[in-house]
């Protein structure tokens, strides 16, 4: 350790010069402060790393203060500490949250870059950070939400990343390489129906032009396109939205609420996420014939709504789901519109969204095969006398989005597991019983970063397993635990990358 002063606390800012200097601004305190590199932190006594902890109150305040940027009529109540939020991507509310992110990270000594899809990268230089092309170790997540969603989904990861930066500054820790926080654009896919859009463009799985031209699907709102809204709110950046031409990422860690019940039911505090299950999104269109509800007998109806209902029931059966149990797959119909939408008119057209998921690519492929069999069966079904049951009706299905099953990096998982054991343990790292390895049921931006850099995720419990809902909740202590695991994971990866020569 290199002692700086024993009678003062200093605020650190960074100068880009060779050799690199720390510029110090003095305030008074009796607390001794030291300046440590990540390597020195690991080389000191074993408890030193464990003493570097985030500020739980500050993290909690950050989470709840960001909830003020919401459409106020979309929350279930007015309590700022419990209400959910609606912060659709590229909305006015999203702009306010983005502005806060930029201003806050700049105040913490970060360089901020915005790319062509609106991803925001805040980078804190490291000891060996003079090369601007050097890839940083990032904590990442998203600030956008679902309509009437929760205040922890995505926000926890961003707030914990900022708390990581604050804690590094508070404790005078100088990382070997640069570290940072990234806010990914349109993770949710609620307003523009391509989830993980920003990270998808960055990774190359989605083309920039396709993303820019995606149209909004928010009911009751004007139709807009992504590029148009990026320009409107001032976040159409100049940096290439590309893993190899834009901001480079050396490793990516994402803290997130579980959004399911497993951790809470088991009494465990941390989920070490090994990967993410496969999923596909479809648009299903059923066409029939509009007719009067009072004058058309049941035998002569081409009722699109009835066929849509039959499709939904049979599609659910594809998963193998049983009452009170499951078959490994998941099917969800989240949006449905019927035309013409009159109470006394038989529906002539129904359009609905379909989300299908499975832990494996093979399992999902089998489900999709059965789905197309179902479409064929409904289009060609016959009654006992051979007359087509659905004459005048048709079912069409279009695949809109696909995400293969993902296995995260072994070395990144190890960083999380070792960090969780240390944070949850008894001072000697024995915290294994309070964590579990698990697979994420939901897609996350880490799916995309995993294509190009070591990636892992950290889960913390969700009350009653509820998410995408105003009642979404994670306790303060669990948020702090996850943030401490995130901090340690980034520091462990920073040392690992230094030891293998990433920063030479």
Which residues does each PLM region occupy?
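Active-site-adjacent substrate-binding region
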Residues: 72, 222-274, 312-316, 320, ...
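Alpha-helical metal-binding/catalytic segments enriched in His/Glu/Asp
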Residues: 139, 148-188, 280-286, 296-318, ...
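A short beta-alpha structural unit
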Residues: 84-89, 332-341, 353-359, 388-413, ...
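Active-site metal-coordination/substrate-binding segment of hydrolases
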Residues: 102-107, 111, 115, 121-214, ...
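His/Asp/Glu-rich mid-to-C-terminal helical/loop segments that flank catalytic regions of hydrolases
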Residues: 37, 102-103, 292, 296-322, ...
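Midchain, well-structured core segments that form catalytic/ion-binding scaffolds
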Residues: 186-187, 193-362
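Acidic/His- and Gly-rich active-site-bordering loop/insert found
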Residues: 42-46, 53-149, 168
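Zn-dependent metallopeptidase/amidohydrolase metal-coordination segment
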Residues: 51-78, 137-141, 256, 429-484, ...
């Amino acid at each position: 350790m290199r002692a700086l002063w024993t009678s003062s606390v200093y605020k650190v800012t960074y100068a880009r010069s060779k050799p690199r200097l720390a510029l110090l601004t003095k305030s008074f305190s009796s607390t001794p402060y030291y300046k440590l590199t990540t390597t020195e932190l690991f080389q000191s006594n074993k408890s030193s790393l464990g003493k570097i902890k985030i500020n739980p109150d500050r993290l909690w305040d950050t989470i709840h203060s960001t909830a003020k940027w919401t459409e106020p009529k979309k929350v279930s109540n007015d309590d700022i500490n419990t209400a959910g939020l609606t912060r659709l991507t590229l909305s006015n509310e999203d702009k306010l949250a983005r502005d806060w992110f930029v201003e806050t990270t700049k105040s913490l000594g970060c360089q901020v870059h915005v790319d062509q899809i609106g991803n925001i990268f805040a980078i804190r230089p490291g000891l060996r950070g003079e090369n601007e092309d050097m890839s940083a170790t990032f904590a990442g997540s998203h600030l956008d939400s679902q309509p009437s969603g929760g205040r922890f989904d995505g926000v926890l990861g961003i707030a914990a990343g900022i708390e990581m930066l604050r804690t590094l500054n508070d404790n005078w820790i100088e990382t070997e390489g640069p570290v940072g926080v990234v806010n990914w654009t349109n993770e949710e896919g609620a307003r523009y129906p391509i989830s993980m859009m920003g990270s998808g463009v960055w990774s190359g799985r989605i083309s920039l032009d396709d993303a820019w031209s995606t149209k909004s699907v928010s009911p009751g709102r004007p139709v807009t396109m992504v590029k148009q809204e990026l320009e409107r709110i001032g976040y159409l950046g100049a940096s290439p939205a590309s893993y190899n031409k834009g901001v480079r990422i050396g490793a990516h860690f994402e803290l997130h609420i579980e959004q399911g019940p497993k951790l809470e039911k088991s009494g465990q505090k941390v989920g070490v996420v090994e990967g993410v299950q496969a999923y596909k999104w479809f648009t299903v269109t059923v066409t029939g014939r509009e007719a009067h509800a009072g004058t058309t007998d049941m035998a002569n109806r081409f009722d699109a709504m009835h066929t849509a209902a039959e499709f939904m029931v049979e599609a659910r059966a594809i998963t193998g789901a049983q009452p009170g149990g499951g078959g490994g797959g998941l099917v969800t119909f989240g949006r449905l519109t019927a035309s013409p939408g009159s109470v006394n008119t038989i529906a002539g057209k129904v359009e609905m969204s379909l989300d299908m998921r499975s832990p494996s690519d093979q399992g999902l492929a089998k489900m999709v095969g059965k789905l197309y069999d179902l479409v064929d069966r409904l289009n060609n079904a016959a009654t006992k006398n051979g007359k087509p049951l659905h004459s005048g009706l048709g079912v069409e299905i279009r695949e809109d989005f696909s995400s293969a099953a993902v296995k995260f990096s072994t070395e990144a998982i190890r960083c999380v597991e070792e960090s969780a054991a240390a944070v949850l343990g008894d001072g000697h790292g024995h915290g294994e019983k309070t964590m579990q390895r698990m697979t994420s049921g939901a897609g996350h931006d880490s799916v995309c970063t995993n294509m190009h850099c070591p990636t892992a995720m950290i889960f913390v419990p969700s009350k009653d397993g509820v998410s995408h809902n105003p009642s979404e909740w994670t306790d303060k202590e669990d948020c702090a635990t996850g943030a401490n695991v995130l901090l340690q994971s980034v520091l462990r990866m920073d040392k690992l990358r230094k030891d293998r020569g990433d920063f030479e």
